[in-house]
C-alpha cells in the first residue's frame, strides 16, 4: 500500500483572535453571538502553497451555562484538499472569580488527493494516477479556565487518527490527520488608562514533530487599535495589526515570514462581527481574548 501524507492542523498567526479554531471550549466565551471569518494564504509565489479559510459562529444560550457553535473550513496544500464542517458544544461553570469551560467538537472532513499531479512516486503505477477521496470523522475536546484578565487552555481539536485506504476500491493510499495537543495561556496588563498589553503563549505538540511554541505580544491603544508580534520557534515571525471599527466589528491582519526560507511570506485576514447589540445582549467591551 502507498502511504499518503498525514494531515497537519492548519497554522494561524492570529489564533488568539478566535481560539475556537484550536479549542472547542471557547464556544460562547464572548457571551454574545458572533461570526468569525478567516482567510490565509501562505508562501505566496510557490505553486501549491497552503491556502486556508473558515467561517464560524458561536454563542451562549440565554440564561444558561451551555454554548454552541459551528464551522465550515477548507485547507489546501499542493495535491491535498481538505474541507469539512464542525459543531461545537461547551459547558461553563463559575469558580469564584473565574470560569471553567469544557467543550467538545464533532464533524466530518472530506479529504481529496490528486496523485496525478506529482511525479514523486514510481512512474507507471496506475494507482498513483488516481484521485483519493475519503470522508473522515473528526472530534475534539478542550478545557478553558479564565478570569477577568487571564486565561489558560488545554485542547486537542483532533482526537481521531483516522485513516481511509481507498483508490477505486483498492487499498493503495492513506488519508489521515495526526492528533494535535495545545496549551494556551495569556494575561492582560494595564500599562495606562489607554494602553493594555496582552502577552500570550501557545504550546503545540504533534506526533513525529518537535514541540513548538508561539510567543506573542499584543498591545492595544484606546480599545481601538492593536499591534503585535509573534515568534514561532524554528519556523516564523509574525506581525499583527487589529482594528476595532465599532462595538460589533473587528478586523485583523497578520504578515508572516519564514525564518529559514526567503521569499515565503504569508498573509492572514480575520474579521469578527458580534450580534449582541442587535439581540439585546450587551457586548463586552473591552474584551481582549
Spans of features found by a protein language model:
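Subset of outer-membrane beta-barrel
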Residues: 7-289
Amino acid at each position: 500500500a502507498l502511504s499518503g501524507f498525514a494531515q497537519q492542523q492548519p497554522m494561524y498567526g492570529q489564533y488568539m483572535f478566535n481560539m475556537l479554531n484550536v479549542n472547542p471550549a471557547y464556544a460562547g466565551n464572548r457571551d454574545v453571538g458572533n461570526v468569525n471569518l478567516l482567510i490565509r494564504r501562505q508562501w505566496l509565489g510557490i505553486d501549491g502553497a497552503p491556502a486556508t479559510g473558515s467561517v464560524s459562529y458561536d454563542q451562549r444560550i440565554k440564561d444558561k451555562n451551555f454554548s454552541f457553535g459551528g464551522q465550515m473550513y477548507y485547507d489546501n496544500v499542493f495535491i491535498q484538499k481538505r474541507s469539512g464542517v464542525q459543531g461545537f458544544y461547551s459547558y461553563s461553570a463559575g469558580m469564584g472569580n473565574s470560569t471553567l469551560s469544557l467543550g467538545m467538537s464533532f464533524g466530518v472532513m472530506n479529504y481529496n488527493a490528486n496523485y496525478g499531479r506529482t511525479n514523486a512516486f514510481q512512474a507507471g503505477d496506475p494507482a498513483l494516477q488516481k484521485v483519493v477521496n475519503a470522508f473522515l470523522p473528526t472530534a475534539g475536546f478542550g478545557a478553558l479556565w479564565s478570569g477577568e484578565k487571564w486565561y489558560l487552555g488545554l485542547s486537542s481539536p483532533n482526537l481521531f487518527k483516522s485513516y481511509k485506504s481507498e483508490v477505486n476500491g483498492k487499498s493503495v493510499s492513506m488519508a489521515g490527520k495526526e492528533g494535535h495537543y495545545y496549551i494556551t495561556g495569556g494575561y492582560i496588563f494595564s500599562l495606562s488608562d489607554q494602553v493594555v498589553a496582552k502577552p500570550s503563549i501557545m504550546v503545540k505538540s504533534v506526533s513525529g514533530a518537535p514541540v513548538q511554541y508561539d510567543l506573542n505580544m499584543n498591545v492595544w491603544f484606546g480599545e481601538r487599535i492593536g499591534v503585535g508580534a509573534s515568534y514561532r520557534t524554528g519556523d516564523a515571525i509574525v506581525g499583527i495589526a487589529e482594528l476595532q471599527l465599532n462595538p460589533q466589528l473587528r478586523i485583523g491582519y497578520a504578515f508572516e515570514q519564514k525564518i529559514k526560507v526567503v521569499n515565503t511570506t504569508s498573509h492572514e485576514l480575520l474579521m469578527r462581527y458580534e450580534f449582541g447589540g442587535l439581540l439585546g445582549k450587551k457586548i463586552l467591551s473591552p474584551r481582549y481574548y
